[in-house]
Amino acid sequence: MKNHDSKSIPHEQPLVGFVERPWGSFKQFAHNCECTVSLMTVLPGQRLSLQSHRGRAELWIVIDDGALVQVGDAERTCRAGEEVWIRASEKHRLSNRGDAPVRVLEVAFGNWQQDDIQRHADDYRRDAGPRTTGT
């Protein structure tokens, strides 16, 4: 397995900037820092594995209503615009119990490597250990 400790991983969620302009406003989720940004789409009735990552923390920004988010043992349904902070090594899962796709923007801080995934539970019977494909 690769070394996932080579980059700084924040323990607390970085400050989210909010700036108003004459034309509207914008939120800034990462500012001058190294991160990996992904747009996840979860199909109706599907969910990611219950997983954790040693080498990165994640900020999830919910795009569509109805995302069911589990962090640790706590589970909650999120509305569009909500943010979820996931610390490195913290178990987490994204589910969709609705009838339309749910999108979540993921901003990963640290060393994003696909093989840095520990699966604790998985509906698709994938290996529990480090992976090289898929989440």
Task: Go through the PLM ranges and name each one.
Residues 3-20, 93, 97-135:
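Double-stranded beta-helix
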Residues 14-56:
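A short glycine-rich, His/Asp/Glu-containing loop-to-beta-strand
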Residues 29, 39, 63-66, 85, ...:
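A structural signal for the main folded, soluble domain(s) of proteins
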Residues 35, 53-68, 72:
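Glycine- and acidic-residue-biased ligand/ion/polar-headgroup-sensing regions
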Residues 47, 59, 66-68, 75, ...:
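Structural motif
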Residues 72-91:
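Short acidic-glycine-tyrosine-enriched beta hairpin
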